[in-house]
Amino acid sequence: MVSRSGCVRSKPLPEQSRRVDRIKLNMSDKATAFDFSKGIALHRMGEKLAGPYFKWQFSQVAPYVGRRVADVGCGLGNMTEFLLDRDIYLGIDTCEEFIEILQTNHNRASNVKTIIADVLDDSFPTILQKNDIDTILSFNLLEHLEDDRRAAVNLVKSLPRRGYLLLLVPATPCIYGALDRWDGHFRRYTKQTMRNLFAALPVQIEKLHYFNCIGALGWWMKGRCAPSPEHSEYDYKLMNLCIPVLSRLERIISPPIGLSIVTIARVI
């Protein structure tokens, strides 16, 4: 299964597997077998239709992005186009196929570099330190990792003092359902679980907020009421219609829940 964390999806934690069983999802293990070509096709459809959504996601962290950026769990590069003006963009993923496609798409950009690396490896911080990275952006990665605490430690170690760690992860555990299982999510987060994740680490959380409250309802409906492992063209178009109003509203009123949580953390 294609995910931002790599080519092969992980299995959810036992307690979340039981939760999924209780809502009687008609999805067998065979139905979630890895199909790279199908995953790429779905991603490209999403990339074409979800441009406004990716832009909205990036706007949540844009003021904090430095000049030398590592995109950890870059996948096929949803955020790459917003970072092409940086001194260096370093795309990092565990999936060789993703990295090859990202390289091909941006082979004329001298500031775009890519590395196949795993955030859980002890050597990971050294890789980023050698590239003088001042900002780490990581969207929709931590939920794919069973040991997300180890990933958090390595991400913090990778940055210099006053460097920024910019994260976006799935939020609102009560909406965990078919889409999460299909995409290999171990969990969804709350503000408190994000604080706990970085407890005792040398970081200051400067901002922590929910993002896309309407999307949480749509995720719940698609994952619980009518389980489906795929986003349709209609789903993307409906979200694009909502973005202009919803983005303005969430700038005025911070939503109490959301599809995602955005975390802005600075190394101290």
Feature annotation, model-predicted:
Residues 36-37, 41-56, 64, 78, ...:
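S-adenosyl-L-methionine-dependent methyltransferase catalytic module, highlighting the catalytic core
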Residues 12, 16-17, 25:
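Cationic, low-complexity basic patches in intrinsically disordered or flexible, solvent-exposed regions
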Residues 23-131, 135-139, 149-152, 232, ...:
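Conserved N-terminal segment of class I S-adenosyl-L-methionine
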Residues 140-144:
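A short His-aromatic
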